[in-house]
Curated annotation (Swiss-Prot):
Protein purpose: S-adenosyl-L-methionine-dependent rRNA methyltransferase which may methylate two specific adjacent adenosines in the loop of a conserved hairpin near the 3'-end of 12S mitochondrial rRNA. Component of the mitochondrial transcription initiation complex, composed at least of TFB2M, TFAM and POLRMT that is required for basal transcription of mitochondrial DNA. In this complex TFAM recruits POLRMT to a specific promoter whereas TFB2M induces structural changes in POLRMT to enable promoter opening and trapping of the DNA non-template strand.
EC number(s) reported in the record: 2.1.1.-
Transit peptide, residue positions per record: 1-44
Gene name of this polypeptide: Tfb2m
Protein origin, superkingdom: Eukaryota
GO molecular function: mitochondrial transcription factor activity; RNA binding; rRNA (adenine-N6,N6-)-dimethyltransferase activity; rRNA (adenine-N6-)-methyltransferase activity
GO biological process, one term: rRNA methylation
Subunit annotation: Homodimer. Component of the mitochondrial transcription initiation complex, composed at least of TFB2M, TFAM and POLRMT. In this complex TFAM recruits POLRMT to the promoter whereas TFB2M induces structural changes in POLRMT to enable promoter opening and trapping of the DNA non-template strand. Interacts with mitochondrial RNA polymerase POLRMT. Interacts with TFAM.
Protein name: Dimethyladenosine transferase 2, mitochondrial
Xref: Pfam families: RrnaAD
Phylogenetic placement of the source organism: Eukaryota, Metazoa, Chordata, Craniata, Vertebrata
Region (DNA-binding): 329-330
Catalytic activity, as annotated: adenosine in rRNA + S-adenosyl-L-methionine = N(6)-methyladenosine in rRNA + S-adenosyl-L-homocysteine + H(+)
InterPro entries named among the record's database cross-references: KsgA/Erm (IPR001737), rRNA_Ade_methylase_Trfase_N (IPR020598), SAM-dependent_MTases_sf (IPR029063)
Species name: Rattus norvegicus (Rat)
Gene Ontology CC: mitochondrial matrix; mitochondrial nucleoid
């Protein structure tokens, strides 16, 4: 998927990310306030890269290299497994579908997928489940591969420490998985249950990977089918009609993906693997009350039209910054945000996207933010499109 970014028009190189991930921006397209004030005293070649804080990612990463501190849930009901197979495979030819299953545990869903004719790669982090999964593999006629690692910890980002380092490129290469163009269909489907404790943090991590076309998204428009809590689901799909739930994370996910609710699963359908190694039903464990909640199965399919000439894996970091800035004071007029964020004429920009100067960020829908960003990027009013206040407090959202 790197190829997608490299094929974009050359002019994007002047206003996009330079360096690894969202950690720095190239001054030719984004300037600090000091840069902008001194624009007449500096030559074009004097510009330099500056760090762009990954503020939502600054949560302590200590969890990544310690043993699992919370129980994990697995599908325990065969009827639920059959329903999941129907949701995952739909009406397509099962043999043409590759399913990556995260922490399958006892392998109830794994067996149901194999029985339906799907190809499965099981990523299992707990050693105790590996022997049973290996026995399934031996009887699966090459349709099952077992990888002993935690899928949610592959390709750690910059602050994270994972031992041993787990790299999707190496794993996928060993499995013979090849990248396809972003414009092609869905090459891989991922099924998993997001860990309750790190649910929001993982949604952010996956989002960064998606927009930067890193990790699993190097291979194309990978479809996620994830069980998440009702709380995070409501935030993920919120619009301005629910201002109490409408947040940056939901805006960015809705811009990136078609989000579809598949079904709700009662907590009694899951078994729980606790740290002591015992497998127990949720309803019998008073110590696991936090896991006694219904989960929502949500499909997140990256949009074929996500990336354009003006929004790409190279400049998505400034799009994130725009949305975060607007939600910092969501009830302030959008024109005030634009005057702080960009050097282009805000009145002209708002006119092009058919918004009034008095409109607020809280009233803007996800697609409005994308149109706003792309209109600014498309503007030829200035070489410098963005002003980045290095000293501003980009607080965690």
């Amino acid at each position: 998927m790197r190829g997608l970014a490299m094929r974009l028009p050359p002019r994007l190189a002047l206003s996009v990310l330079a360096g690894r991930g969202p950690s720095c921006i190239l001054g030719s397209g984004a300037a600090t306030r000091k840069d902008w004030q001194e624009r007449n005293r500096r030559s074009f070649s004097d510009l330099y890269t500056q760090p762009l804080p990954d503020c939502d990612f600054e949560e302590s990463s200590s969890w990544t290299h310690k043993s699992r501190s919370e129980p994990t849930r697995h599908i325990a009901c065969k009827k639920s497994a059959r329903n999941l197979v129907r949701d995952l495979l739909e009406h397509q030819n099962p043999s043409h579908q590759l399913i990556l299953e995260c922490n399958p545990g006892p392998g109830i869903l794994t067996g149901a997928l194999l029985k339906a004719g799907a190809r499965v790669v099981a990523f299992e982090s707990e050693k105790m489940f590996i022997p049973h999964l290996e026995s399934l593999r031996k009887n699966a006629d090459g349709e099952l591969q077992v990888v002993h690692c935690d899928f949610f910890k592959i390709d750690p980002r910059y602050q994270e420490l994972v031992r041993p380092d787990v790299n999707s490129h190496t794993i996928f290469q060993n499995l013979g998985i090849k990248a396809v163009p972003w414009s092609a269909g869905v090459p891989i489907k991922v099924f998993g249950i997001l860990p309750n404790k790190h649910e929001r943090r993982l949604l952010w991590k996956i989002l960064f990977d998606l927009y930067s076309c890193e990790s699993i998204y190097r291979y194309g428009r990978v479809e996620l089918n994830m069980f998440i809590s009702e709380k995070e689901f409501r935030k993920l799909i919120a619009t301005p009609k629910r201002p109490d739930l409408y947040q940056v994370l939901g805006v960015l996910w809705q811009v990136a993906c078609e989000i579809k609710f598949l079904h709700m699963e009662p907590w009694s359908s899951f078994s729980v693997h606790a740290e002591n190694g015992h497998l127990e039903k949720s309803k019998h464990s008073e110590s696991l009350n936090l896991l006694k909640q219904n989960l929502y199965l949500v499909r997140m399919t990256p949009r074929r039209t996500l990336f354009t000439e003006n929004l790409s894996p190279l400049n998505y970091d400034m799009f994130f910054h725009l949305v975060k800035h607007c939600f910092g004071k969501r009830n302030a007029p959008i024109i005030h945000h634009l005057r702080s964020l960009s050097t282009v004429d805000p009145i002209n920009i708002l006119r092009q996207i058919r918004k009034r100067p008095g409109d607020t960020a809280a009233k803007m829908y996800p697609h409005d933010f994308k149109r706003l960003f792309e209109t600014i990027e498309r503007s030829e009013d200035s070489v410098f499109k963005w002003i980045y206040d290095y000293c501003s407090d980009d607080s965690e959202l």
